[in-house]
């Protein structure tokens, strides 16, 4: 299998996983009797994890571990956490598991990008084609967990825990597939300190007006997520 095909499949499953549970989650939580505030806190898990994940995973991966191996481990652990989260019926049982799951998933977004960047011959030419498969994966997850089952004569699965189980199963699939990805060894060898772990050394990039505009637009774009 060609490297670009492997990377495209990786990106497809990566975003399929998130779309499978994230979009229909509120339907299941509402049906299970969760309050509006509890549903809001559940959706906040990914945002909290996105803030913490660079500290917990990003800096360590850059220096000590191959990206594809970390991806595999995080996917396997995430699959277990998502499976048990899908069995919960109370907020006190569900929220900690979803938060823990989010802490394993959110770092994989950067990991898959790093793996793709490191293993394509021409980033400007090849990466957009690979990354668009992630968008397609998100769309397909909406079809699979949305109206497609009803079109095939089955009952609606969106207000059930099945989308979460689909996400768990897809995580196992990507965890296994990660061992087939090209080796992406750590590149950074610099000193690891709190400033680096928090990403504060990257703030110097904000001096570039073009990057500042990009940063601000990305911030606004990510708010609904």
Predicted regions and their residues:
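Structural signature of the two symmetry-related core transmembrane helices
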Residues: 69-83
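Symmetry-related core transmembrane helices of the 12-TM Major Facilitator Superfamily/SLC fold
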Residues: 161-179
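Residue-level signature of mid-helix packing/kink "hotspots" within the transmembrane helices
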Residues: 47-55, 139, 143
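Helix-to-loop junctions at the C-terminal end of transmembrane segments
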Residues: 52-66, 149-153
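Hydrophobic core of transmembrane alpha-helices in multi-pass small-molecule transporters
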Residues: 12, 81-82, 91-111, 115, ...
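Helix-loop boundary and gating motifs at the non-cytosolic
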Residues: 1-48, 210-225
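Transmembrane alpha-helix termini and helix-breaking/packing motifs in multi-pass membrane transporters
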Residues: 140-166
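Juxtamembrane intracellular "pre-TM" segments in multi-pass secondary transporters
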Residues: 1, 181-216
């Amino acid at each position: 299998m060609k490297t670009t095909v492997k990377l495209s499949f990786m990106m497809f499953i990566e975003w399929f996983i998130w779309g499978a549970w994230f979009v229909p989650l509120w339907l299941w939580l509402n049906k299970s009797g969760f309050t509006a505030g509890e549903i809001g806190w559940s959706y906040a898990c990914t945002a909290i994890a996105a803030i913490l994940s660079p500290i917990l995973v990003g800096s360590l991966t850059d220096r000590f571990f191959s990206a594809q191996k970390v991806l595999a481990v995080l996917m396997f652990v995430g699959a277990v956490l998502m499976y048990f989260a899908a069995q919960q019926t109370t907020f006190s049982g569900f929220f900690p598991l979803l938060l823990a799951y989010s802490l394993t998933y959110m770092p994989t977004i950067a990991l898959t990008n790093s793996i793709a960047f490191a293993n394509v011959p021409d980033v400007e030419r090849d990466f957009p084609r690979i990354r668009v498969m992630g968008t397609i994966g998100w769309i397909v997850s909406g079809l699979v967990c949305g109206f497609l089952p009803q079109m095939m004569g089955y009952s609606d699965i969106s207000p059930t825990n099945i989308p979460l189980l689909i996400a768990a199963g897809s995580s196992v699939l990507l965890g296994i597939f990660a061992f087939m990805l090209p080796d992406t060894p750590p590149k950074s060898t610099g000193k690891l300190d709190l400033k680096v772990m928090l990403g504060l050394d990257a703030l110097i990039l904000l001096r570039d007006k073009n990057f500042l505009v990009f940063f601000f637009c990305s911030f606004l774009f990510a708010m609904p997520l």
